[in-house]
């Protein structure tokens, strides 16, 4: 329900009530009722306090506050500006007879009651606590298009409306996130259209050659492209090119008008031929899928074969051919399963050569060579041989054998030498192709092999070295049971040690020499090893008088083992024999805690192995007769018989029934110890054992049961006149109950009460006031009792009763009371004024009244009386005493501002109705205001700055007034207002302000530098602005401003001026330069990839399309020749403030190796027109890739010319990287990413109108118009920037675009 509706309903009800009452004399008289009875008036007045923040207009109450009935409004409320007051008066003629049951009266009373309920409800809803914490828009009623909820303090809008007050029309689909909603209509962002901006617009409206379907052009049959502006090409370029104005531009690898043909391969040639193979190669092409190679003997096309060759391969060896035969070889390029025209090659294989040759037999000084005779005619052979390392070559003539093979035995050779052998077939004097092979004579074998220095597992063998050159010797040795090992020995050595031999074993040893895979004959000898000794001798299962020792059995064949053990003190030695099959034995008769040295060795006949040894310390014996005695609540003594062995200490461990464990060491001389820290009433398990080093004896054990503990920290608290509470810390032991006994000190009366075991406090009752009691508490379990804890309990004294005040004057009052029952020392009377002044006086114990003196007039006092005995006090009885009235004192003025002042005074002591304050200006203007009696200060408002006022204050009660107190108040100068910085740059800013209303002499402006330095400026009274200059970049300056007049100053007004700082200390591009608050176009230093060591000066365009562009090319005057060499285009040339080219290397570094994705913009202008093209991706590759260009998707007004150049390398007149037959840079007078040749030629000859030679952008002005202004620029993709404030720099824009 709205506020107006809430007001409307009760008002209607009230009007109905008034009309009903007006007609009452004619309708309210039932039979038997007289009209001459008493008149009764019912008066109701309601006040609703509406917050001043609510938009509800309240008019003054036209009715007087007084009426025949009592008013429900307090004094002063009628003057409040935001009170809504409803009043109705109902006069009823009440007859003498009981007419309460009359129907009309009943109905009227019911309607009046309903009216009251509605008014109460409205008051609650419109209170400051219910009206949504000061919501000020309730009167809008949600603009009539929704429902306001008091529960949520918000509007619930109708469909199609939105806003906090449903004040706006809603747009369909919230404009799909692609537009702005204005008055219920979507204003779409480019390039979106539709009622809800739901889909993008079609480019160029499909150029009239297609239909637009949800943002995509469906072109007519003869047209194509995104905007259907291009004429379709033959066969749609077969899917192997792109169409431009009806002409196909084929992809690499395709050719023809419709791009249907594959480019023919080039450079097919013969690299190598043999009697059965041909190796061919050709120029590689990266634009094919694979190659198709075919070949056949000349004149035998039907026997041809085809081979598919991968595109990465550009040579192939054809195998399995006939000797001396001519072959036709053809090669085709294949792309997308389309084959090119073939390229042909005629090649011939060689004649047959000798078959395989080999060495059939080798000795130390001869080699037998054999080879296969060829199928062709051969007259004889020449055989040449010589050492591989020497120049000496011998030659012999060998006749051709009639057998399929020929052979020759070469003699007189050196042992172990490799020879190079050549067999040449001869026919007449003509040599055929020779066959080569190598042969090596055998190596001589070692002599005088002997064995010496034999141990259990090693033996040394030696020999006389061989004469041949060798790589190494090989030694092989085999045991009697067939175990064989082999080892290599350096060629310069003539002996070696055989390891890993088995003890007591006979070995056969062989030695021979090797070179490569060649080995000499073997020489041999014999070796017999010694017996091994027992290994891994260990001691285990040791007791106090025995020990078991074990060992690994020896490998050799033996008769027995011998064991000898000796005590550490050498008092006893024993020796025992153990069978050869055993590997352990038990040593008996040992003494506890003694270490023994044990030796074990093997025997066979009179031969003995080496001795193995170990140590065997016997166990310590354990303590005996462990007992527990002298047990208390938290400790127990344990004792035992000492052990016999020599030990370091005893260890005692005791564990409670709850699992808590402690462990303590005990000196070796002791045989008892005290266990401490035990818990009362707890059973403990005790273990004791002896230790020596890491050695421990067996554990002895016993049990210990502690006593019950007594209650602790027994205290008395919450003591009254006849009762006291005692409490204690519960015992830790398990008990049945507590017992509490308390005895009076006065007559010895004693009481004893049981308390549950779960309790730790109890209340002692039946006590007498002011008596001391002795209290004992102890715990019980069965017949067992703990020790008794005791404390004292002193009951309180009873307090005085019936305290009253009488005989009050301005400065005295008499108080009296009934005396207490307890024995006391005195009474104490304590009285405190309303302002906190306190006095305290003692009164004799026989008295029951006293006079309070030194009171202040008109002051209320609180009086307390209580009894004392020693340090003990009774409860306090209290009453009030009120003295008579006086006037205000100490009137002072403080907290004076330019338009207000606070006056304060000492409040009067008397009870008053209010204070009155009157203040008069120096020119006679007077105001008088009432102040509540509770206040002792007030604020004088509506004062004028710089004015003196006379202030009077007095108290009132009814018609009575106190004397007037007076003082003076001088208002302050008002300060300047609205101090604000503006036009802030990196080095300064403008400060502006509004002057004060007071008459002043001038201003003082103060500002502080970052280093703490303060500068002060005095300005004239007419100044309203000041320019701060020479400030530091990115710094904050506190600024304050005061007005002054003579020696008086106004309040400070302050602000801060923060100069523009650099967000990016090392900006990597112009977008970051712009974000450093540089708003003007011009030369700036950027840093490649943000690296401070790689600065680069560039021209930044801060204006075009939000700015942030790095300009890398400009043509606008024609004064700079762009027909440059490769090196110039790589490094860059020209003046960035005029015409220039930034450089390919810089473009590569800017657009690669960085997370930023760059877009490129081309701006074109003539004298009367302008156009632009933007591509959402731009990248220049490295020099290795000839600075290949990559661009993304196009948008703009100039037409798409760069997509044609996408993926192509840069070309200059001295570096041709295009695919045209001629050099495009040479024929088109520039440097560019030419293909075959261009649709864009920004670096062409300035002003040239010949076809394709000028500064062209073909989609905009064609090939025969030279564009007078071109600018190429890049920035991060998607970057946008609202205009920024900053230091303006001079721009070249006007001059750069002057043709």
Curated annotation (Swiss-Prot):
Every Fibrinogen C-terminal domain range: 1061-1278
Domain EGF-like per the UniProt entry, residue ranges: 167-198, 199-229, 230-260
Record keywords: Disulfide bond, EGF-like domain, Extracellular matrix, Glycoprotein, Repeat, Secreted, Signal
Subunit-level organization: Homohexamer.
Compartmental location: Secreted, Extracellular space, Extracellular matrix
Family to which this protein belongs: Belongs to the tenascin family.
Residue runs in coiled coils: none
Main location: secreted
Disulfide bond annotation, renumbered to this chain: 171-181, 175-186, 188-197, 202-212, 206-217, 219-228, 233-243, 237-248, 250-259
InterPro entries: ECM_Regulatory_Proteins, EGF-like_dom, Fibrinogen-like_C, Fibrinogen_a/b/g_C_1, Fibrinogen_a/b/g_C_dom, Fibrinogen_CS, FN3_dom, FN3_sf
Key word Nucleotide-binding present: no
GO-annotated molecular function: identical protein binding; integrin binding
Region (Disordered): 605-624, 960-982
An example Gene Ontology CC term for this record: tenascin complex
Name of protein: Tenascin-N
NCBIfam families: GGGWT_bact
GO biological process: axonogenesis; cell-matrix adhesion; dendrite self-avoidance; negative regulation of neuron migration; neuron projection extension; osteoblast development; positive regulation of neuron projection development; positive regulation of sprouting angiogenesis
Tissue and organ expression note: Not detected in normal adult mammary tissues or brain but expressed in most breast tumors and brain tumors, such as glioblastomas, astrocytomas and oligodendrogliomas, tested. In brain tumors, detected around the endothelial cell layer of the clood vessels.
Keyword ATP-binding: no
Domain (Fibronectin type-III) ranges: 264-352, 353-444, 445-532, 533-623, 624-709, 710-800, 801-886, 887-976, 977-1063
Residues glycosylated per entry: 1149
Annotated signal peptide: 1-28
Function summary: Extracellular matrix protein that seems to be a ligand for ITGA8:ITGB1, ITGAV:ITGB1 and ITGA4:ITGB1. Involved in neurite outgrowth and cell migration in hippocampal explants. During endochondral bone formation, inhibits proliferation and differentiation of proteoblasts mediated by canonical WNT signaling. In tumors, stimulates angiogenesis by elongation, migration and sprouting of endothelial cells. Expressed in most mammary tumors, may facilitate tumorigenesis by supporting the migratory behavior of breast cancer cells.
PANTHER family: TENASCIN, TENASCIN N
Organism from which the protein derives: Homo sapiens
Biased composition (Basic and acidic residues): 960-977
